């Protein structure tokens, strides 16, 4: 008799995705982040669901309802901090996952990569709207500043901003719709992640060498299930440590002050995972130029397959490209640091140089380095 997992319509999908899936035998721990992102998403949906049971999306009561969750709800503080810091872990895994894709040339799977870029935008939008919900000072002013960027769009900008606000400023209507969008988007993300996996399983996984692994495949279970469980335990350990020992480490103290439209905080800045993009935005003196640079700083990922000039897929055997890749990583750390600093000398010029370097590395230096490496192959 054939095993039920190979015949049952639903079990068959699970079997072909997580059990009998032929997987390259040499994929490293850098391939763990897909499953970790799945765990993060499930955690965020569950904690978010329980938070939504006690949260009220009204300007008068939003801040108080979050305080009520932390003080009066059983383990409410734990759920709230798991959700807030879970977002940070989500982005750490996302950045490492994207970095892995860039290093090993996984972007050559075009459909998988493009859905990944859409997923990145969706997660960033979700995180931004979630940050507005506690209705603290940084929530309110962050929402005001970021939504206001759309006013830079010629002709329709101002109308567009007022349409998103649902009025002439960030107010009750804005908070209510942000809560609605923040609730629905994770389910859209889950669906997109399913499509992401669907396209990945059409081609099979890439591997560190960038060479075809068709001749050497092993079943996903038990080899990679046990490996993913180890990754999950490390993720849970890191998240638990953050939540239980320093839950406010990555947050902004200003968000413990209720939103006040009459008092602007001295330094408006987003959560740490947006700082690199925020630094690029601020480094351009022109409003529309800054917005375009901000969008393009993420959208540039979609161009990666077209900027690939090397004869090899992976960077494993390309030392010049490796150096430039790690320079790009260092540059992103620099941009993240600058994004959290006030707009004054010398931070302005450092931010501008780091922004120029970011685009130069991706658009000019890395494709040229690949061409040089192609020549070295012949030499």
Swiss-Prot record:
Key words of the record: Electron transport, Heme, Iron, Membrane, Metal-binding, Mitochondrion, Mitochondrion inner membrane, Respiratory chain, Transmembrane, Transmembrane helix, Transport, Ubiquinone
Protein name in UniProt: Cytochrome b
Localization (cell): Mitochondrion inner membrane
Gene field: MT-CYB
Assigned protein family: Belongs to the cytochrome b family.
PROSITE patterns named among the record's database cross-references: CYTB_CTER, CYTB_NTER
Positions bound to heme b b566: 97, 196
Miscellaneous comment as given in the Swiss-Prot or TrEMBL entry: Heme 1 (or BL or b562) is low-potential and absorbs at about 562 nm, and heme 2 (or BH or b566) is high-potential and absorbs at about 566 nm.
Gene3D superfamilies, sorted: Cytochrome Bc1 Complex, Chain C (1.20.810.10)
Record's bilayer topology term: Multi-pass membrane protein
Superkingdom of origin organism: Eukaryota
Residues that span the membrane, as ranges: 33-53, 77-98, 113-133, 178-198, 226-246, 288-308, 320-340, 347-367
Keyword Transmembrane: yes
GO molecular function: metal ion binding; ubiquinol-cytochrome-c reductase activity
Xref: Pfam families: Cytochrom_B_C (PF00032), Cytochrome_B (PF00033)
A single Gene Ontology CC term: mitochondrial inner membrane
InterPro entries referenced in this protein's UniProt entry, alphabetically: Cyt_b/b6_C, Cyt_b/b6_C_sf, Cyt_b/b6_N, Cytb/b6-like_sf, Cytochrome_b, Cytochrome_b_C_euk/bac, Cytochrome_b_N_euk/bac, Di-haem_cyt_TM
Subunit-level organization: The cytochrome bc1 complex contains 11 subunits: 3 respiratory subunits (MT-CYB, CYC1 and UQCRFS1), 2 core proteins (UQCRC1 and UQCRC2) and 6 low-molecular weight proteins (UQCRH/QCR6, UQCRB/QCR7, UQCRQ/QCR8, UQCR10/QCR9, UQCR11/QCR10 and a cleavage product of UQCRFS1). This cytochrome bc1 complex then forms a dimer.
Cofactor requirement: heme b
